[in-house]
Amino acid sequence: MQLSLGPVLYNWAPERWRDFYFRIADEAPVDVVSVGEIVCSKRSPFFADHIPAVVERLQSAGKEVLLGSLILVSLRRERRQTEELASAEGALVEVNDLTCLRTLAGRAHAIGPFVNIYNEASAAFHDAHGARRICLPPELPLASL
């Protein structure tokens, strides 16, 4: 079993955001870390300059890094942002909105907690289309696993 840390959902100052992930890299006993702005596309530019350093630091510490997509993609610029994310090299994309799947076109990726996977058929569908990791919804009863 691996311990995963989801992305920061809060609107922190960019330096605080960066320093948080640096501490995770140096101190936290987690295996997988999801980074990126998933809540609001308007906040993305504030963190963009820090993402390469954060990814490098986490990977150097032996963490697997997932690049999180937006939870809700509705604007043209958000679709472009999703396409840019899908073309990124060096880390799996964590899909949090199904519009991201089109741009991944069968490439390896992760399914984040904001995509509802409640049954085996859904999991099999995503597996067949490149999902290598699926984060199940927290409300899913243990008996259903």
In which residue ranges do the predicted regions lie?
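Glycine-rich, proline-tolerant flexible connector loops at the mouths of alpha/beta enzymes
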Residues: 26, 31-53, 57, 69-76
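Conserved beta-strand positions in the central sheet of alpha/beta enzyme cores
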Residues: 4, 32-34, 66, 94, ...
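Active-site mouth loops of central-metabolism enzymes
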Residues: 1-19, 44-45, 70-74, 108-117
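Active-site-adjacent beta->alpha loops and helix N-cap segments on the catalytic face
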Residues: 14-15, 41-54, 76-78, 95-107, ...
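Short beta->alpha connector loops at strand-helix junctions that form conserved
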Residues: 36, 113, 136-138
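Glycine-rich phosphate-binding "P-loop"
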Residues: 59-73, 81-83, 108-110
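Conserved, mostly hydrophobic/aromatic
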Residues: 24-25, 97, 126
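Glycine-enriched alpha-helix->loop->beta-strand junction motifs that scaffold or abut catalytic
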Residues: 28-31, 87-91, 105-111, 125-133
